[in-house]
Design a protein with these regions (language model features):
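Pocket-edge structural micro-motifs
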Residues: 13, 65, 138
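Conserved phosphate/anionic-ligand binding catalytic regions in large, soluble enzymes, centered on
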Residues: 16, 69-76, 156-165
Length: 174
């Protein structure tokens, strides 16, 4: 993962739950061939924006209001964000379980109160994960953001908790 993430904003409102992100009808709970995640991708966010998967430009950033990711624990609700092509989610507030699940797969999800008022759909933003700043390129407005913990960053930069454990195992046994 890059230290500076830049991308086009796709914006959603408050209370985007895991049923909206990954509709239950698309989840078979067990397909190991990857077809399940593709099915989830085709229906992600369709309750609010039918055909949303066709709109997303790879490398984009999702911005949302309060309570992003609330609801049931679904691995697909986090993995589908990567499958759609997002590099980052930023919301006014994020459900703790959703954020932890995202970190576990190496996907950054940031809580930035007020972000939904700062950017609009289609804006381009830069998020500097070294200096912990966020800039809206439309008007150059820049704000400081709360850094993630060292362990969260380590997990994300490793590509997820499993990859971090593999790295740690190799270091311990070589």
């Amino acid at each position: 993962m890059e230290k500076i993430i830049s991308g086009k904003v796709y914006k959603f409102g408050n209370n985007i739950d895991t049923d909206i992100i990954s509709p239950g009808m698309t989840i078979s709970f067990g397909l190991a061939d990857g077809s399940e995640l593709e099915e989830v991708r085709l229906h992600a966010f369709e309750e609010l924006r039918p055909g949303f998967y066709k709109e997303v430009i790879p490398g984009s950033i999702m911005v949302a209001g309060k309570n992003f990711g609330l609801g049931s624990h679904r691995e697909q609700a986090t993995t589908v964000m990567k499958k759609l092509g997002f590099t980052l989610v930023i919301a006014d507030s994020v459900a703790r379980l959703y954020q932890r699940n995202s970190f576990a797969i190496g996907f950054p999800v940031l809580e930035v109160p007020g972000i939904s008022r700062m950017v609009e759909e289609g804006d381009y933003i830069d998020v500097d994960l070294y200096n912990w700043t966020l800039m809206n390129k439309k008007n150059n407005e820049t704000i400081k953001i709360e850094p993630l913990s060292e362990i969260a960053l380590k997990i994300i930069y490793s590509g997820g908790i499993i990859e971090l454990l593999k790295e740690t195992w190799k270091q311990m046994h070589h």
